[in-house]
Amino acid sequence: MPKASDIKKGSAIEHNGKVYFVKEITKLTPSGRAGATLFRMRMYDVATGSKADESFKTDEIITLADFSRRSATFSYVDGNEYVFMDSEDYTPYTFNKEAIEEELLFISEDTQGIQILIVDGVPVAIELPSAVDLEIVDTAPSIKGASASARTKPATMTTGLTVQVPEYIANGEKVKINTTEHKFMSRA
């Protein structure tokens, strides 16, 4: 069984008789000799969707929950619900906008490589690919000869995400964005 220090963002764990999805992990290192490192986890109850914040000691044993990943594509929006379609058996998976708000910044109609995490038959989270291609809708005009310098400018994507891009990038171009660091990687 893994220790608290081995748990990663996006894991499903069992705690106090409930299954939680780990959304965020913060490492807390208290000052002083006797202070043990703590891992503060922001989790969501799979059954109810309620938020819970728990702290675990580094060597505390945590039980991983059984979960599966299914490949899916974004299908459509129905009010406040976002529907994703299973790539193999076309099962629809519905998510509330608030539950996947951060992930929506990287999802466009043609985003490939999306994974749905399923615990006990219930879709609990979306796992994004490491990089996605998005189109720029708003940025300052490109500067000729700017490829020689490493200066950047803000650019807004079709999804609303804003990242820093090199000065030579123009509106309408597709760029590759790193989903974990929220950074420009290259032209698509």
From Swiss-Prot:
<dbReference type="Pfam" id="PF01132">
    <property type="entry name" value="EFP"/>
</dbReference>
<dbReference type="Pfam" id="PF09285">
    <property type="entry name" value="Elong-fact-P_C"/>
</dbReference>
<dbReference type="InterPro" id="IPR014722">
    <property type="entry name" value="Rib_uL2_dom2"/>
</dbReference>
<dbReference type="GO" id="GO:0005737">
    <property type="term" value="C:cytoplasm"/>
</dbReference>
<dbReference type="GO" id="GO:0043043">
    <property type="term" value="P:peptide biosynthetic process"/>
</dbReference>
<dbReference type="InterPro" id="IPR008991">
    <property type="entry name" value="Translation_prot_SH3-like_sf"/>
</dbReference>
<protein>
    <recommendedName>
        <fullName>Elongation factor P-like protein</fullName>
    </recommendedName>
</protein>
<dbReference type="InterPro" id="IPR015365">
    <property type="entry name" value="Elong-fact-P_C"/>
</dbReference>
<dbReference type="InterPro" id="IPR001059">
    <property type="entry name" value="Transl_elong_P/YeiP_cen"/>
</dbReference>
<dbReference type="Pfam" id="PF08207">
    <property type="entry name" value="EFP_N"/>
</dbReference>
<dbReference type="InterPro" id="IPR013852">
    <property type="entry name" value="Transl_elong_P/YeiP_CS"/>
</dbReference>
<dbReference type="InterPro" id="IPR013185">
    <property type="entry name" value="Transl_elong_KOW-like"/>
</dbReference>
<dbReference type="InterPro" id="IPR012340">
    <property type="entry name" value="NA-bd_OB-fold"/>
</dbReference>
<dbReference type="GO" id="GO:0003746">
    <property type="term" value="F:translation elongation factor activity"/>
</dbReference>
<comment type="similarity">
    <text>Belongs to the elongation factor P family.</text>
</comment>
<dbReference type="InterPro" id="IPR011897">
    <property type="entry name" value="Transl_elong_p-like_YeiP"/>
</dbReference>
<dbReference type="InterPro" id="IPR020599">
    <property type="entry name" value="Transl_elong_fac_P/YeiP"/>
</dbReference>
